[in-house]
Amino acid sequence: MRKFCLLLILSLALPVFCLLQAVEPPKKEIRAVWLTTVYGLDWPHKPATTEAGRKAQQQALLDILDRLQEANFNMVFIQARLRGDVMYRSAIEPVSKTFSGKYGELPGYDPLAFVVDECHKRGMECHAWFVTFPLGTEKSVKEQGKLSVVKKETKNFAKRHNGEWYLDPGVPETADYILSLVKEIVKWL
């Protein structure tokens, strides 16, 4: 009986070991970081309202990327859509005031292009990620004025809840709207 159990275990284990040997390792290891742009959490910490501010803002990103390169990171996920605003010139949503201090204005350079170029110079991939449903507080929507999707949209897919605005994921137009942003950034790249 003992020999039978051993033979049974080996006959079951052998195919598993063979499968483990046949699995190829991934072509590359992903060592990534998410850089958040909303609320000045990761970058930028403050808007660039002057030429010196622009240079300081760009240098702050260079410092982050240099540290990531030294730590052998090979990929950056940058938050390209914040909360109803973006970090690049868009025909759909305003540029975030996080970068220049004013909605709809670039800080004298294109922040997304700058991030992508600087990542590539360091041999790192750069991927844009979006915050999809949150649009911002009542205050930020008012600051955006006519640039806000809340003011522009006519199909009622933006909803307010507890003083915050959101795209309603239960409305088909929301998916169309998000897809339009994705298509825009893909064409931009």
Q: Which residues does each PLM region occupy?
A:
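Bacterial N-terminal signal peptides
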Residues: 7-16
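Positively charged n-region of N-terminal signal peptides that target proteins for export
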Residues: 1-4
